[in-house]
Amino acid sequence: MADNSKFIDIKESIRSKNPALLKLIPKFIINYLRKTIHEDYMNDILDRHKKINGLDFVDSMVHKEFKINAIVKGFENIDPSKRYIFVANHPWGGMEAATLLDIVGKKFPEPRFIVNDILMSIKSYHPLFIPVNKHGSQGRENARLMDENFESDKPILIFPAGLVSRKTKGKVVDLEWKKNFISKAVQYKREVVPVFIDGRNSNFFYRFANFRKAIGIKANLEMFFLVDELIKNANSDLPYYFGKPISYQTFDKSKRPQEWANAVKEHVYNLKEDYTRKFM
């Protein structure tokens, strides 16, 4: 595949975000990053599937390329006539999101996932993604698109942590969940469906993340290993536990939005034990 048709280009991604930084990075570092994120391998996959998009693309990635076997519990109780925000933990870094889209898309034909705008470089996902710029101010167009989708009947999917789970005190858990999904649920009168995804990355990923943090590096360097983790997690069983929908009216003034977000996160991590349990 010619360079001008690349779907993923680490050098161009850095250039578009921070041209000054790119000038400071030696060529051998760029080449190392390309190898680390399996740039050629991923571009080959995307090139072979460039004529399909949306849920068809997701189906191909989940079932043909990476062969993820979702073991789903509780989804049969989700009413397709209602408006939902699906919130889940974020254990892997990519393919668990595609698999969640695949599951939800079987019952809801137009699911939408709120994602980092960097992922918009994969055009086959465009019909399914609502971009958010986590590295700068969100543009007016993205804000308009966000409101338009929340006002619609389309199900909205969110990883409230925004980042992949880390290992803390021996347990793989999300970082703090952002409160935005609580505010949106109340504003747009949507029920919240809690989802627990029972997955994890390699010990290397967690050790690297903890080492990076221990030596005082703030940059999320472990993100460069997520494609490597994606490949390691291929051909896996991945359990999904869908809890009972939570009414937006639950999120009253008795708690602050962040406290409600923390409570929903705790509830999600208890779903593996009993996904039929009620929230609070």
Predicted regions: what they are:
Residues 60, 99-106, 183, 187:
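Residue-level signal for well-ordered alpha-helical scaffold segments within enzymatic catalytic domains
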Residues 2, 10, 143-280:
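Non-catalytic C-terminal accessory region of glycerolipid acyltransferases
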Residues 39-41, 84-138:
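Catalytic core of membrane glycerolipid acyltransferases/transacylases, capturing the structured
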Residues 65-67, 108, 124, 187:
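Short, well-ordered coil/turn elements that cap or connect secondary structure elements
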Residues 1-84, 97-99, 126, 280:
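Membrane-anchoring hydrophobic helices of lipid-metabolizing enzymes
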Residues 73-75, 114-116, 132-133, 243-245, ...:
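Conserved beta-strand termini and adjacent loop/short-helix elements that scaffold enzyme active sites
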Residues 61-67, 132-138, 170-171:
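Short, flexible loop segments at the rims of nucleotide/cofactor-binding pockets, characterized by
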